From Swiss-Prot:
Expressing tissues: Expressed by the venom gland.
Protein name listed in UniProt: Toxin ICK-42
GO CC list: extracellular region
Family the entry assigns: Belongs to the neurotoxin 27 (Jztx-72) family. ICK-41 subfamily.
Keywords associated with the record: Disulfide bond, Ion channel impairing toxin, Knottin, Neurotoxin, Secreted, Signal, Toxin
Organism: Trittame loki (Brush-footed trapdoor spider)
Domain of life: Eukaryota
Location (main, coarse): secreted
Entry remark concerning the domains of this protein: The presence of a 'disulfide through disulfide knot' structurally defines this protein as a knottin.
Pfam family, one: Cys_Knot_tox
Disulfide bonds: C40-C54, C40-C77, C53-C66, C80-C87
Length: 87
C-alpha cells in the first residue's frame, strides 16, 4: 500500500512541477483581435497559418505561431517563451 501512495504522490508532484502537457501558452497574456479587427485563433486551437493566431502582448519575451502539436495530427496556435527550449 505504501509504494502505491508514494507513486501517486510522485505523479502528482510531477504534474504540478511540469505543468499540463497541452497548455500551448493559453495563460500568457495575448491580444484577442487581429490588426484588421477580426478575431484571432487562441493558443491551443486549430489553425492553418501563423497570421490567424493571437499575438502575445509582450512580443519581446514571447513568440507565437502555428505548428504541429505533439501527439496531435493537426496544426495549432501556440505562444511560448523565446528562450525556452520546449517551444
Amino acid at each position: 500500500m505504501k509504494p502505491i501512495v508514494y507513486m501517486l504522490l510522485f505523479c502528482a508532484f510531477t504534474v504540478v512541477i511540469l505543468g499540463h502537457p497541452n497548455n500551448h501558452g493559453a495563460l500568457i497574456p495575448h491580444h484577442d483581435k487581429l490588426p484588421n479587427g477580426e478575431s484571432c485563433t487562441r493558443p491551443g486551437y486549430s489553425c492553418s497559418e501563423s497570421n490567424q493566431c493571437c499575438t502575445p502582448v509582450d512580443g519581446e519575451t514571447f513568440t507565437y505561431g502555428c505548428g504541429r502539436a505533439w501527439m496531435e495530427g493537426s496544426k495549432i496556435c501556440y505562444i511560448c517563451n523565446r528562450e525556452s527550449s520546449m517551444c
